[in-house]
Amino acid sequence: MPRLPLLLLLLPSLARGLGLRDAGRRHPECSPCQQDRCPAPSPCPAPWISARDECGCCARCLGAEGASCGGPVGSRCGPGLVCASRASGTAPEGTGLCVCAQRGAVCGSDGRSYSSICALRLRARHAPRAHHGHLHKARDGPCEFAPVVLMPPRDIHNVTGTQVFLSCEVKAVPTPVITWKKVKHSPEGTEGLEELPGDHVNIAVQVRGGPSDHETTSWILINPLRKEDEGVYHCHAANAIGEAQSHGTVTVLDLNRYKSLYSSVPGDLL
């Protein structure tokens, strides 16, 4: 048999095997597209990532990061996002939240930190004219910045023999080094800074991360409080980008003097 007729005979079976016969057909449940019968589109939180439904006919919103997804009526997630199941809650079974496929914070070319590359892309699409040039990822991880004192040490008034502490809360990237120093006055009248705790057996310094991301909190504990502990205490934070400092004052009243002052007050005034 000539080759050409044989090839023509084999084409129908090849088409069935490769699924070419169904190519171009719509989903079995889809009717001919009539866009005038499409439901009124609801306002999309991110209209630039809208798409068509499964039948390729009616406009449909794609979920932005954090939007509900999945289930019979849930939206599809936008590009770069995946639908992750919820850990718990009252949400319908089979639904989830749109999360970025690439996890981790990033630093944008605008100097701002974004929770994910998807959040950065959303910002770039939302306000393209607000930035000189195209907003893009500058580096993985949050943007670096100099320390900022969020909660400075407060002034303290107390009597000798008690326990007191000063705290200092700082935010910075990378993590700063926090030190405590006390203003010292020499007999000649000059001022200097003494790094603590030094040789003081009644002073301890502690540092821990938190309470939030990129924050560090440090305490200086004085126990027992002595009259010579009175003065100004500086909280100093520094990293590779810069430094910041704040201070608090400790005022100490001698306990014996306090008792004598208290006992000298007439009874009718107490």
Swiss-Prot record:
Residues 1-17 form the signal peptide. One of its GO terms (molecular function) is insulin-like growth factor binding. Its main location: secreted. Glycans are attached at N158. Coiled coil: none annotated. Residues 87-145 form the Kazal-like domain. Residues 147-251 form the Ig-like C2-type domain. It is found in: Secreted. The gene is Igfbpl1. It comes from Mus musculus. Transmembrane segments: none annotated. This is Insulin-like growth factor-binding protein-like 1. Gene3D superfamilies: 3.30.60.30, 4.10.40.20, Immunoglobulins (2.60.40.10). The keyword Ribosomal protein does not apply. The keyword Glycoprotein applies. Pfam families: I-set, IGFBP, Kazal_2. IGF-binding proteins prolong the half-life of IGFs and have been shown to either inhibit or stimulate the growth promoting effects of the IGFs in cell culture. They alter the interaction of IGFs with their cell surface receptors. Keywords: Disulfide bond, Glycoprotein, Immunoglobulin domain, Secreted, Signal. One of its GO terms (biological process) is cellular response to tumor cell.
